[in-house]
């Protein structure tokens, strides 16, 4: 419609110029007489011919200008729409990224709270395990006490044997006194029976204690079975995690397939762009053909001029020819308009298809992003110690935002150059490359997440291996305890046999037996108290575990509900914004179409009225104009032809120069932009490489530090002292030495290969059993060794040293052996290979891993606060 309006205006302006020339010619005086009518008609016909040629040329130029302007306007509108869509997409993506950042921050806060709660639980568990260990130590001390009492009884039996020997000698000397002592023997028999009953009661009490200990052993076995059940549960959980990982791998494969489909669609778009360029070339060829047609029409007009030499006979033919010419011009215009409309509709359909394809691609990209978010959420539950990687991801998101801002600035610059086709095609190619780069980055992130999952699986498997080793060690300890119980039973049987043999000499031991009974009652009371404490501790532990499990399940449910609500709200908002934007654009388009239609109709009506007026004027003034045009026609033909040729050559040269200048300027601008973009991309790549190198160096440093720490821990040697005889040590020294703790200590001396394997898991997962064993080791190292002293002197350990004191008692006293620790230090220091690894100023035997890590350069918390959870 705009083409029709502009071409009509140009045609009307040409008719007005003709009318003005005719009117001026009519007003001018006629110098020739009326007798020379033939010459004047010939000149007027030549003038008409010139004006007709001018009109044809002007119409052709107007058509070309209109077509160029229309194509430029269409391209400009399309580019503006595309740029607006890109800006909206960038704004939406920025909003989504901000929402994601807020959600990630909330999730990290929740995870920190969970980690703190789990740490408190671990501390409580370690405390309870320490209490249980102390109680077991007390029970073992009670066992040793009973063994001491049995030794005293054996000594008493030996004394009784001596007395029996003496009494037998006396009986041989005093056979005469047998008759008088029969009554006394009867009394002795009664006392023996009483003693038998008392000893039977003692045996029954010892049996009850053994049964109680058996029950304790059974309880320990039940706890081991519970641990096995927990291990089975952990195995099932691991299988579930493996299934989830397989599902995630399938999702990654689907994502790769979607990426391949998007690349194929990009190739299709490139092919379509090439088709559009071919169509533009075809349009240029059509324009050339139209120009040739116009030249043919000019030839036909010249032929008509030759044929119409006489005015009187051929004026009607001229009028009819003009009318035919106008009809043909109108028909050509209508055909051009129809073809342009068809092409415009075809282009609109293609544009709609492209928009739909872009929307489909956007939906697919959003689905991919949502899947990636779900994968990140599932892995964030397991990945608590990967905070640095998340920080790097946030930095990358910020860089992407900065790149989006830079792209927005580039878009504002590109809007100025949106009038040319070449710039637009190159920008589309750059956008496609950037999209491919983004997809490659997403693929790299997915690969990183998969590698992290594999690392976590390896860590969990190592933890399971450690737990299985712990269970095996506990089973070995239980078997050893069973052996100890059997040895005790054998000793009891031996004592019973000794008691049966020496029933006659138990009259003197009644007082001692009473003391023993009192001690047994005290021991039984202490055992009952310990059992009650154990049951209470177990109940408290079970209650704590159940409460924590309920709290964790509630917290997880709340988090899932919040995430679902936030996702639904974002989707609703996005859909509402889409609908609003579509409605607004539709309303704008309808308004523009209506306005254009109204304007075109108004212009058409005005043009029709003007054309009718001018036709009337032309018919009235035609008779007067013909004579004057024929007179001036012959003189002006030669001059006009020369003038037109020069103008055409000049215009062509100017147009070619302008096109060359524009093309050169556009190429230069394009090259400058490409260079700037390549420089920016290279700088970004270098920054990313530098950051990766820094991270790698940090990780290598941490690994080296951990290896040094574990090597230092492995080099602490432990001296095992062998027991040669019971005479070298007193009963109090046996109390202090704990074989059970020594065995636990030996079980923890693991090979260096297992230590290397456990390096990665030392700070991640610390089981309560390992903490308990380490604390027991610490206790055994702190206990000083003793030796037997039979003198009346004894020493007291103070802060400043030892002080010797004298007392008149004859009890055995223990001296600590200060040289044992020194010997340990000396043996550790003599090794030259170990001297290099120990840091100057540090203790050679650190009591705990925390003390080791708090030393100078071996502290990993100085650079990485999240290295050990």
Curated annotation (Swiss-Prot):
Transmembrane segments: none annotated. One of its GO terms (cellular component) is nucleus. It is found in: Nucleus; Chromosome. Highly expressed in panicles. Disruption phenotype: Decreased pollen fertility due to abnormal synaptic behaviors and increased crossover formation during prophase I. Residues 64-298, 330-614, 641-713 form a coiled coil. GO terms for biological process: homologous chromosome pairing at meiosis; reciprocal meiotic recombination. Keywords: Chromosome, Coiled coil, Meiosis, Nucleus. The keyword Nucleus applies. Residues 841-869 are annotated as: Disordered. It comes from the Eukaryota. Required for chromosome synapsis and regulates crossover frequency during meiosis. Acts as a transverse filament protein and constitutes the central element of the synaptonemal complex. Interacts with CRC1. This is Synaptonemal complex protein ZEP1. The gene is ZEP1.
